[in-house]
């Protein structure tokens, strides 16, 4: 017969494999934060830049279903509960959407823009080449149950290995 310690270990392993344990931990962290958060204490007002940055992050978090992380961001930063209009964000960032697919977060388009470089062909030195890839491919891999790349990007990567050929629905207009 199994001991209590063995049963705990099997239960923990099973919950980790199913991704439930991480979900539960995130939910508990979010609930603890909400319980400790003092609503009576006024939040400092957000600068325009922080409002935009937080909204880009929220859009990314919600797209990737990090809903508890997004709820903590909103509560902690003082970001409005109602998301900013996407067209407002695009206008404020001087960005444009390359396609009608507006389901992909603007951050993906911004990242793709800097990975491709600027219009005149000058590449961003901070994001170019080997600095993005560790010399040992096993380095930098997360021991997560999540796929290393989002499903929507993985499908596109199979079609093309060149980042410029990936379908990205937004790019920054400079």
UniProtKB/Swiss-Prot annotation:
Described function: Involved in the biogenesis of cilia. Required for the recruitment of PLK1 to centrosomes and S phase progression.
Keyword flag Phosphoprotein: yes
GO molecular function ontology, one term from the record: identical protein binding
Species for this entry: Homo sapiens
Effect of residue 106 to R: No effect on interaction with KIAA0753
Pfam families according to UniProt: FOP_dimer
Subunit note: Homooligomer; probably required for localization to centrosomes. Forms a complex with KIAA0753/OFIP and OFD1; within this complex may stabilize the interaction between OFD1 and KIAA0753/OFIP. Interacts with PCM1; this interaction may be mediated by KIAA0753/OFIP. Interacts with PLK1 in later G1, S, G2 and M phases of the cell cycle; this interaction recruits PLK1 to centrosomes.
Record-stated family: Belongs to the CEP43 family.
Protein name, as recorded: Centrosomal protein 20
């Amino acid at each position: 017969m199994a001991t209590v310690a063995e049963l705990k270990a099997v239960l923990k392993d099973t919950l980790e494999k199913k991704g439930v344990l991480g979900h539960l931990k995130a939910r508990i962290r979010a609930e603890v934060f909400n319980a400790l958060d003092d609503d009576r204490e006024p939040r400092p007002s957000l600068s325009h830049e922080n409002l935009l940055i937080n909204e880009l992050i929220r859009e990314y978090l919600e797209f990737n279903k990090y809903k508890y992380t997004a709820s903590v961001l909103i509560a902690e930063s003082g970001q409005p509960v109602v998301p900013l209009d996407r067209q407002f964000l695009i206008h404020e960032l001087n960005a444009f959407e390359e396609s009608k697919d507006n389901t992909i977060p603007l951050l993906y388009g911004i990242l793709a823009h800097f990975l491709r470089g600027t219009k005149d062909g000058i590449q961003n030195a901070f994001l170019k080449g080997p600095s993005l890839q560790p010399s040992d491919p096993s380095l930098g891999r997360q021991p997560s149950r999540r796929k290393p790349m989002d499903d929507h990007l993985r499908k596109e990567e199979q079609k093309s290995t060149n980042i410029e050929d990936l379908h990205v629905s937004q790019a920054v207009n400079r």
